Regions:
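Leucine-rich repeat
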Residues: 2, 23-252
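A structural signal for leucine-rich repeat
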Residues: 133-137, 161-168, 186-195, 212-221, ...
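Terminal membrane/secretory targeting segments in land-plant proteins
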Residues: 1-27
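Basic polycationic patches enriched in arginine
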Residues: 11-15, 64, 371
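Hydrophobic lipid-interacting interfaces of membrane-associated proteins
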Residues: 180, 206, 230-232, 261-263, ...
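Innate immune receptor modules and recognition interfaces
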Residues: 31, 43, 52, 317-373
Length: 373
């Protein structure tokens, strides 16, 4: 396994000896009541620390404590601005490597890694080959949530590729990376992300056809999908000058949020028979073709709505909740006419300041919520 324990990693992480220990030294003067607690209680205590690297430092207390942190049910590595200089950031990367190499449990419920952001004076970049072993660890041992956030580097390394390996037991994936994200998919098909219920991808570049295949074939239980500020590579529609088409097909999807996909100028097609909630992009230049007969919540923050371009062909005419804004007055009216019944209407009221009147006026922005029935 690519994440086998490395003795040198353990030595760096623990920094203790077999001859003596801190708790042993204290025990000569007072009774040690903490080390006698159950592993479950000690895990609860260590999980309150800032991150797993701090929990690993408790290894210096005694031989008893050396195995406690290595069986934590959750691994979290979060770093603040103090690690934003290159040398400190490199140490942060090493701490993640060492902790994963020394981890002893067969499975882990959470793997959360947030790397330092670049400093104003010196960029901190993590090459994808450095982050790849972390994803392999998740593929082999994670049974819950995966969250990976790498530094934003102004797109200087967009062409680097990061491969998301097959993760059969991972239930939620949150990826915030500026590189190109690839999916490890078997050629013969098969559900390789069988437990995945939530997927959020931010800032990454993705191949549109690969994303389509991944969502439609390999995520049979996906419930929630968020695509935020991603760069989608797509060929033109049929080679006849038509705009490119991104198709999202899922029999299980219930919530779809593409509100921050402003860079995509093509056609978004959605076929999701179980979709309940949809939040499209704020960019009104994209066409929509939505087939979602169970749609009940629509969050429309786009500056325009054109029934000829934004089609809800197989959606009903009864919404549980509609969110829109009067700042896009004509679009809001046209959108509300699309549905006969709305149980809850939330809209933002914007009144601009008028300069030509004899008395001063003021701009106003507020939210109004109306419930009917």
């Amino acid at each position: 396994m690519g994440t086998a324990a490395d003795p040198s990693s353990k030595r760096r992480l623990m920094r203790t000896t077999d001859e003596d220990d801190v708790v042993g030294g204290c025990r000569r003067g007072a009774e040690d009541r903490i080390s006698g607690l159950s592993d479950d209680l000690l895990h609860s205590i260590l999980l309150q620390l800032r991150d797993t690297a701090e929990a690993a430092r408790t290894s210096i207390l005694s031989r008893r404590w050396r195995r406690v942190w290595a069986f934590l049910p959750e691994l979290s590595f979060g770093y603040d601005g103090s690690e934003s200089v290159p040398a400190a950031a490199a140490q942060a990367h090493d701490r993640v490597d060492d902790a994963l190499a020394a981890y002893s449990a067969a499975t882990v419920n959470l793997l959360e890694i947030t790397m330092p952001y670049a400093s104003p004076t010196g960029g901190v970049h993590i090459h994808t080959d450095r982050a790849a072993p972390w994803l392999r660890f998740a593929s082999e041992r994670l049974t819950g949530k995966l969250s990976l956030s790498l530094p934003y580097d102004d797109g200087a390394h967009e062409e680097e590729e990061l491969l998301l390996p097959q993760c059969e037991r991972v239930t939620a994936i949150y990826l915030d990376v500026t590189c190109t994200l690839r999916f490890q998919l078997p050629p013969a098909g098969g559900a390789v992300f069988t437990a995945l219920a939530t997927l959020e991808i931010s800032s990454a570049g993705v191949d549109g056809r690969e994303l389509e295949r991944f969502l439609s074939t390999f995520c049979p239980h996906l419930k929630e999908l968020v695509l935020s500020w991603i760069r989608i590579t797509l060929r033109d529609g049929d080679g006849d000058g038509d705009p490119p088409v991104l198709s999202i097909r899922s029999d299980s999807l219930r919530r779809l949020d593409t509100s921050a996909m402003g860079s995509f100028k093509g056609v978004l097609k959605v076929a999701a028979p179980e979709l309940r909630s949809f939040c499209p992009s704020s960019c009104g230049q994209r066409d929509l073709d939505i087939a979602a007969p169970k749609l009940s919540e629509l969050l429309w923050i786009s500056p325009c709505y054109d029934p000829a371009r934004h089609r809800f062909a197989e959606s009903g005419r009864h919404l549980r909740r509609l969110v829109t804004s009067t700042s896009i007055r004509h679009a809001a009216v046209a959108l509300m006419r699309r549905f006969d019944i709305v149980d809850e209407l939330n809209f933002e009221v914007s009144i601009s300041e008028v300069h030509h009147l004899p008395h001063p006026t003021y701009s106003l922005r507020t939210h109004i919520s109306c419930r009917f029935g």
